[in-house]
């Protein structure tokens, strides 16, 4: 019995000693980076609206836009809540509308308005684009070194270079698909605005130049196609 008491005393003393020693271990404090930057990856989803449409042209379905990339943050003040953002990204945009792009025997693209006067039925007509984009943003936010959750308003300018464009037509005359049509304006640019809290932000893009080159006109009326896009949606910023 005496042996058990001595053993119990030794174990109890050792346990209490360990607990006391563990309690003396200092807990490291949270490191705060006063020179933080909001370098961010971004992902966006938009509904694409066509404006400045030629006579008889209309959108015929949901037109989707997707974008993603990375933006480097360059703070401009000591508080670091005002900054410039420089980035690079990729975008995909589809446009469902009734401008039928058909190439003639000389491989020249013609642009037909598929309105009520068009004599053949069709079930699908759209074009879509792939672009490399360079966004530039002026950034205002309520961020602090301690928090990653804040309100933001980012205004900016975006330049995009189309490296691929594709048109699709499906109807009574058959299925027509063309790649890299010369009539598209390869250089596209516009104004941007994103505003919101934390990850979720509303996004607007307003194009400043038309989708097609200046010499592109409708086939029958010879009307210049000056249409451009407004994109409305959501953009997500991820640290």
PLM feature spans:
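Extracellular/periplasm-exposed beta-strand and loop segments of Gram-negative cell-envelope proteins
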Residues: 54-61, 96-129, 162-190
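Residues on the lipid-exposed face of transmembrane beta-strands in outer-membrane beta-barrel proteins
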Residues: 68-74, 88-90, 134-140, 155-159, ...
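Structural signature of outer-membrane beta-barrel domains
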Residues: 48-50, 89-95, 141, 160-164, ...
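Outer-membrane beta-barrel transmembrane strands
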Residues: 53, 123-145, 204
